[in-house]
Design a protein with these regions (language model features):
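Surface-exposed amphipathic alpha-helical segments
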Residues: 1-4, 25, 31, 133-166
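Charge-rich, low-complexity N-terminal segments
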Residues: 1-9, 46-48
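Solvent-exposed loop and beta-edge segments used for protein-protein assembly and interaction
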Residues: 17-19, 48, 100, 129
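Envelope-exposed proteins and targeting segments
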Residues: 21-23, 52, 121
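Secretory pathway targeting signatures of secreted, lumenal, and periplasmic proteins
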Residues: 28-84
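Charge-rich, low-complexity terminal tails
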Residues: 40, 44-62, 127-155
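Signature of long, low-cysteine stretches enriched in small and polar/charged residues
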Residues: 79-131, 144-146, 158, 163
Length: 166
């Protein structure tokens, strides 16, 4: 729940997101590892068998129909598995888009091409003057039920307290 997130968050990672993307949001305290490039930030827990990740990315202005493909391209460019040839992708056929409170919510499955990894993701997409801002969370927990994990991650990327700095 958001109440739990308010008391168990990571101020340094939140400041990193605010500086790079202008977004004020709460990041779970366990998310400590990060990778950054110009329009992309990946924050994750360190557990190999219970990985929870948050990606913040900026997309160029594009129609809603192209968002999933654009997100997929950025993920494959920035997130790689243990094998050098493996990269993360969205299973595009699984992606569903709905709109709530002026923000688009994407859900579906992700997979690691070239590796036996995959799982659910949830993302919020907010149109901005420069294009679109994406907050995407995904889980890799092969031995665990993911329903509660994804509820927690959905709270991170989609709640009324996120400020997009507009």
């Amino acid at each position: 729940s958001y109440a739990f997130l308010q008391h168990n968050h990571h101020p340094k990672m939140e400041e990193k997101i605010r500086r790079q993307f202008g977004v004020q949001m709460k990041v779970p305290e366990a998310m400590r590892a990060s990778k950054t490039s110009k329009d992309f930030l990946w924050i994750a827990t360190n557990g190999a068998e219970n990985l929870r990740s948050l990606c913040v990315l900026r997309l160029a202005d594009s129609p809603k129909a192209d968002w999933a493909r654009a997100i997929d391209q950025m993920l494959s460019q920035h997130i790689h598995g243990d094998q050098a040839s493996s990269s993360m992708h969205l299973a595009l056929a699984t992606v569903q888009i709905q709109q709530e409170r002026g923000i688009h919510l994407l859900t579906g499955q992700w997979m690691m091409e070239g590796d036996a990894m995959g799982g659910p993701f949830v993302a919020s997409v907010k149109k901005t003057r420069q294009g679109a801002l994406v907050l995407l969370a995904f889980a890799y927990a092969p031995e665990r039920e993911k329903r509660n994990i994804m509820r927690q991650l959905r709270t991170v990327v989609f709640n009324e307290y996120i400020s997009y700095g507009e």
